[in-house]
């Protein structure tokens, strides 16, 4: 039985992960924590999320005493916190010997030079960063099992990389073009005008400048053109990706490449049949559908995930179970 502390439990991702871990026979929840300045401290989780009324846990402030209690009692800590907050908390808990599963972007790049540009801070813990493993569960299981510092991928990179990594050896130098739409929960729980019911509308954002683009590039090993879109639905991501494959590539070659997922129970691959967001919402699954034109050499692959599940909480749970061999 492994004991897990969840920091940032009042947000969509933290609450979703709480529900997932609560349902696991081999895991227990050491505690749920929020910032000492949070208006939610002291509240039962079910006050914020009535659908979790079966989870009788309260949101505690992350005081120094709480940190000491986590170190004494927990086997791992999950950080569902802002990037700049995770930066320091992850390094501290790692130094105390706990396994750290960070859902922010603070440890996703191995190159410290990336952080000022994409996250607005200098990375102060290069020695911890050097130990961090990118937690793309279907691809990095051995590394996840071997380290105590796991950077859980972003939602868009999870959808995109799950679709693209099998094709890496077949790609030409032409940039893959990724157009992805996410539900409004991807913007977080904090009230914002552009995500309010009366204002939200399908629109691109972060064009040629979204921080998930270099994350995808780093893990794929090739430049991409990535355009995210805000959708007028609650949860889910659909990424439609167009790539050019090397001359002589056949449909059979593509099918063989995607056979890498034959033993991956959470990834479904279909030829000439494309996924729908509704089919993956509230599941830990990724559905892929692809079609290849041998004459032009262009392939279109669509990837559907739940941004709060496979794109965040359920992938963190995958990483926890891989790390602890559960």
Curated annotation (Swiss-Prot):
Q: Where in the cell is it found?
A: Cytoplasm
Q: What is its EC number?
A: 1.2.1.38
Q: Which PROSITE patterns match?
A: ARGC (PS01224)
| CDD domains assigned | AGPR_1_C, AGPR_1_N
Instruction: Name the Gene Ontology molecular function terms of this record.
Output: N-acetyl-gamma-glutamyl-phosphate reductase activity; NAD binding; NADP+ binding
> In terms of domain of life, where is this protein from?
Bacteria
Write out the GO biological process terms: L-arginine biosynthetic process
Name the catalysed reactions. N-acetyl-L-glutamate 5-semialdehyde + phosphate + NADP(+) = N-acetyl-L-glutamyl 5-phosphate + NADPH + H(+)
Q: Does the keyword NADP apply?
A: yes
The record places the active site at: 155
Q: In which pathway does it act?
A: Amino-acid biosynthesis; L-arginine biosynthesis; N(2)-acetyl-L-ornithine from L-glutamate: step 3/4
Got a GO cellular component term for this one? Answer: cytoplasm
**What keywords tag this UniProt record?**
Amino-acid biosynthesis, Arginine biosynthesis, Cytoplasm, NADP, Oxidoreductase
Q: Does the keyword Endoplasmic reticulum apply?
A: no
Pfam family of the protein (one): Semialdhyde_dhC_1
Function of the protein: Catalyzes the NADPH-dependent reduction of N-acetyl-5-glutamyl phosphate to yield N-acetyl-L-glutamate 5-semialdehyde.
Would you identify the family this protein belongs to, as annotated?
Belongs to the NAGSA dehydrogenase family. Type 1 subfamily.
What name does the UniProt record give this protein? N-acetyl-gamma-glutamyl-phosphate reductase
Q: Which organism is it from?
A: Shewanella baltica (strain OS223)
């Amino acid at each position: 039985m492994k004991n897990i502390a969840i920091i940032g439990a009042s947000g969509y991702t933290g609450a979703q992960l709480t529900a997932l871990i609560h349902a696991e026979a081999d895991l227990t929840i050491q505690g749920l924590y929020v910032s000492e300045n949070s208006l939610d401290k002291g509240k039962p989780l079910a006050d914020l999320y009535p659908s979790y009324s079966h989870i009788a846990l309260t949101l505690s402030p992350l005081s120094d005493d709480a940190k000491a209690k986590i170190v004494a009692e927990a086997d791992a800590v999950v950080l569902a916190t802002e990037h700049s907050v995770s930066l320091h908390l992850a390094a501290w808990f790692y130094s105390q010997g706990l396994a750290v599963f960070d859902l922010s972007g603070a440890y996703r790049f191995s190159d410290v030079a990336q952080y000022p540009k994409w996250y607005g801070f200098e990375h102060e813990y290069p020695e911890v960063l050097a130990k961090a493993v990118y937690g793309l569960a279907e691809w990095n299981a051995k590394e996840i099992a071997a380290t105590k510092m796991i950077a859980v991928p972003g939602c868009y990179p999870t959808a995109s990389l799950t679709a693209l990594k099998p094709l890496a050896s077949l790609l030409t130098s032409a940039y893959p073009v990724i157009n992805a739409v996410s539900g409004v929960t991807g913007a977080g729980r904090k009230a914002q005008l552009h995500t309010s019911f009366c204002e939200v509308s399908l629109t691109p954002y972060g064009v040629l400048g979204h921080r998930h683009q270099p994350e995808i590039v780093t893990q794929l090993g090739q430049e991409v053109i990535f355009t995210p879109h805000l959708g007028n639905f609650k949860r889910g991501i659909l990424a439609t990706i167009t790539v050019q494959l090397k001359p002589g590539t056949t449909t059979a070659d593509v099918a063989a490449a995607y056979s890498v997922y034959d033993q991956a129970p959470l990834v479904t691959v279909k030829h000439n049949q494309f996924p729908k967001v509704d089919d993956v919402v509230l599941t830990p699954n990724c559905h892929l559908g692809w079609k290849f034109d041998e004459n032009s050499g262009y392939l279109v692959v669509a990837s559907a995930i739940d941004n709060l599940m496979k794109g965040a909480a359920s992938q963190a749970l995958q990483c926890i179970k891989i790390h602890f061999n559960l």
